[in-house]
Amino acid sequence: MAFRTLDDIGDVRGKRVLVREDLNVPMEGAAVTDDTRLRSAAPTVAELADKGAIVLVLAHFGRPKGERNPEMSLALVTAAFRSVLGREVRFVGDCCGEEAEAAVAQLQPGDIALLENTRFHKGEEKNDPALAQAMAKLGDLYVNDAFSAAHRAHASTEGLARLLPAFAGRSMQAELEALEKALGKPEHPVAAVVGGAKVSTKLDVLKHLVARVDHLIIGGGMANTFLAARGVDVGKSLCEHDLKDTALAILDAADAADCIVHLPYDVVVAKEFKPNPPTRTVNVHEVAADEMILDVGPAAVEALGDALKTCRTLVWNGPLGAFETPPFDTATVALARTAAALTKGGSLVSVAGGGDTVAALNHAGVAGDFSFVSTAGGAFLEWMEGRELPGVKALEA
């Protein structure tokens, strides 16, 4: 897929550049508790400012539902963004209209302004052309650097890109290039790890992947549904029994596409789901009626590691077990470390995404060793489903 980037933007000196970023950071009181998204936004904003642009940052924050809510004002994020950038950032109390126009008129080349939460306007999430037009009045050029919001056709992500010359920022560019490498034009064999609690939330992902990957590793609670579909008694494990036929259809589609599906054959079980309860490691056919499967067993994890050693590309979304609760993080940590070692050794391109996945890789201490880790949740999932992302489509050259 060809798209325009900052390399194509030309001379920006004195130009007003509207830059859509994802600054939707977690807060505790007045403090930002994780500045990952601010750090991800910094390179594009700094590059444009250094080149003499007047940089106008657009972003959403929380879900104010079209109402002004001081608890969701981007004023709360301004100091942290200033600190990450290491330069002055002015806050402007609206993202369009007279107040914003007057504030922007005062700015000089190289200045950076953070405009107020786009979702304070009802038209943002409706992709209202009038709101997009009002925001477009502030700028000469548009840069979208928020892949995590690219699956939404909103006024500040899709509408604006139709009204001004539109380009991908550095974070968006890195994300798109990594995703293209992982599933667009990957080097085979390709493995996908898909985990999480429910098959129902990842149905479209699984259906899309079986025709595109060589190894499909299914973990988490959703593996129980596939095991049950194959006649395994999963005890009181989380399981969507009503989706057994769907699971069988996915397995049949995988067979037809020569995709090897890896389900656990040994598992870690417990009678209670709590930190460090008594556990047993058993064959999947030995789960007692009062036990639940909470992690993949060591023999299966070793076999999964061996499968990864034969692969050139890995896409990972979702943990293998209930990783937030020890000791059920063991399988996820072990396989993540294997993938990280293969990546560092140069034999594997590894791309991971989704909130739980990032948390799991951080927990394993290997997020920095993967080829690319996406902080996007919904957008990453929709990309894995093969859907067209409106915010990306609008940037195509």
From Swiss-Prot:
Subcellular location: Cytoplasm
Listed EC numbers: 2.7.2.3
Parts forming coiled coils: none
Keywords: ATP-binding, Cytoplasm, Glycolysis, Kinase, Nucleotide-binding, Transferase
GO biological process: gluconeogenesis; glycolytic process
Reaction(s) this enzyme catalyzes, per UniProt: (2R)-3-phosphoglycerate + ATP = (2R)-3-phospho-glyceroyl phosphate + ADP
Binding site for ATP: 202, 324, 354-357
GO cellular component: cytosol
The keyword DNA repair is assigned to this record: no
SUPFAM superfamilies: Phosphoglycerate kinase (SSF53748)
Pathway: Carbohydrate degradation; glycolysis; pyruvate from D-glyceraldehyde 3-phosphate: step 2/5
Keyword Aminoacyl-tRNA synthetase: no
Domain of life: Bacteria
Major location (coarse): cytoplasm
Subunit and partners: Monomer.
Name of the protein in its database record: Phosphoglycerate kinase
Organism whose genome encodes this protein: Rhizorhabdus wittichii (strain DSM 6014 / CCUG 31198 / JCM 15750 / NBRC 105917 / EY 4224 / RW1) (Sphingomonas wittichii)
Gene that this polypeptide is encoded by: pgk
